[in-house]
Amino acid sequence: EDELKAAVQAAERLYKNGCLAPLGVCWSALLAGQTLETALAIVPRQERFYADHVRGEDARTFVIVSDALRYEVAQELTERLHGRLSGNTVCTAMVGTIPTITPVGMAALLPHKKLTLTEELSVLCDGMRTDASQREAVLRAACPQSAALELGVFRRMTRAQRQEIAREAKVVYLYQDVIDRAGESDGDVFAACETAMSEIEQAMRMLVSELSAACIYVTADHGFIYTRSPLEETDKAERELAAGDVLCYKRRYAVVRENVSDERTLSMPLTMLGRPEWACVTPRGDLRFKQQGGTSPYMHGGLSLQELVVPLIAYRNRKAGQKGYRAITKADIVLLGENRTISNGIFTLVFYQQEAC
């Protein structure tokens, strides 16, 4: 047990010091002195999701929004879906909306012409509130045949109830909160990621088999930074770095009324939220602002690669004969080696898979 703990600690140090820290430094250097629009101009933006993918789609569209589904988790989910769902599944990336928090990311994924951050720090879509109870109204303002509900509620419905929703709605948003809930409550984030992937896969299989879904998207409001070990003092930045008229101060970000620059922080104007005179200030790399009681290793809100990049899984259910159709078949394997005789109770067999995954 002691050896296992030592191995876990060594792996954690290697990840933090050999990957997370240097990657954070390089990423911060890329963003420094620029806006997201200029620094990442060639990457699709989260706020354009509905306009680019949902509006104008002929097929009934299902959108699964998983709170804090990080890009790497979505990539693993995509690899699983390749072997379990016929059709075509592709995972690409989008640039999230800052600060990378749930109210902002969820609003950005809804239909809108303009996003607005209010003085109370709530986000409006064309003047409409975007909290959970109001998202269906925002969707219906763009497409009257829309529905929004929790993924868990949808999965617990009877087949007839799910079919009734599909008959009445052209656009269905399904919301999942597994990863973020575990992270915010100091739960096991790794286990939560596995649960989230399993639930999404089951939901997609259900949508395809029961409702003949031809177009499914899976995306997220934001990503996250996570390490197993609690934060140390060296992981924290002084609160004074968030200078100016501070409207909101959290461990990974602060919203200030003026765009101030400091070599120890990144400061981005909130242009996408209709507040170009305001700024989101975050410590460079993976540091956190000092805050009483702030020791949780799960974090989001900042501008790191892990927080800012959100996935977009696009699934198309192609039928046989259609372009892009991919049938699920069992792979052929052959036994390597000439020896076909088992001479004792301990032996090794080496197989070769003839087709690529």
Which role fits each region the language model picked out?
Residues E1-C357:
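Feature captures the catalytic ectodomains and active-site-proximal regions of enzymes
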